[in-house]
Amino acid sequence: MEHPSTNYTPEQQHEKLKHYVLIPKHLWSYIKYGTHVRYYTTQNVFRVGGFVLQNPYEAVIKNEVKMAIRLQNSFNTKAKGYVTWTVAYNDISKLYAKPDAIMLTIQENVEKALHALNQNVLTLASKIR
């Protein structure tokens, strides 16, 4: 069953993708259980996504086995409105994941180190002139 899409303006999409990281396709299968993802379909429809339940997941879609990601909207399977759904990798054009605190810390540290390195290069360049 196809879920009716909610149309989001480009501004709303941008806001919903804040703090999410675009994942290159060759790394999709490494996204872990529990990670929250958002995505664009191959028809360029923005989806707010859900939490990874299984990935990678071999799904039979229209009598064909496809690599897919299985998502859920909650971790409480007894919650009212709990649903799971499968999205084939081939039906996704862009996949974004919300990094955990460890990854955000690593990213922050890399950015600080890069900034310090750039400052050192500028200092050395000014001394050479």
Curated annotation (Swiss-Prot):
Q: Which UniProt keywords apply?
A: Host-virus interaction, Hydrolase, Inhibition of host innate immune response by virus, Inhibition of host interferon signaling pathway by virus, Interferon antiviral system evasion, Viral immunoevasion, Virion
Respond yes or no to whether keyword Ribonucleoprotein is given for this record: no
Give yes or no: UniProt keyword DNA-binding.
no
The GO biological-process annotations, alphabetized, read as:
symbiont-mediated suppression of host innate immune response; symbiont-mediated suppression of host type I interferon-mediated signaling pathway
E.C. number, please? 3.1.4.-
Q: What Gene Ontology terms describe where this protein resides (cellular component)?
A: virion component
Q: Which domain of life is it from?
A: Viruses
Q: Mainly localized where?
A: virion
Where is this protein found? Virion
A GO molecular-function annotation: hydrolase activity
Q: Which family does it belong to?
A: Belongs to the asfivirus C129R family.
State the protein's purpose.
Answer: Plays a role in the inhibition of type I interferon signaling pathway. Mechanistically, specifically interacts with 2',3'-cGAMP and cleaves it via its phosphodiesterase activity. In turn, prevents 2',3'-cGAMP interaction with host ER-resident STING1 leading to inhibition of downstream signaling pathway and type I interferon production.
What is the protein name given in its UniProt record?
Uncharacterized protein C129R
Natural source organism: African swine fever virus (isolate Tick/Malawi/Lil 20-1/1983)
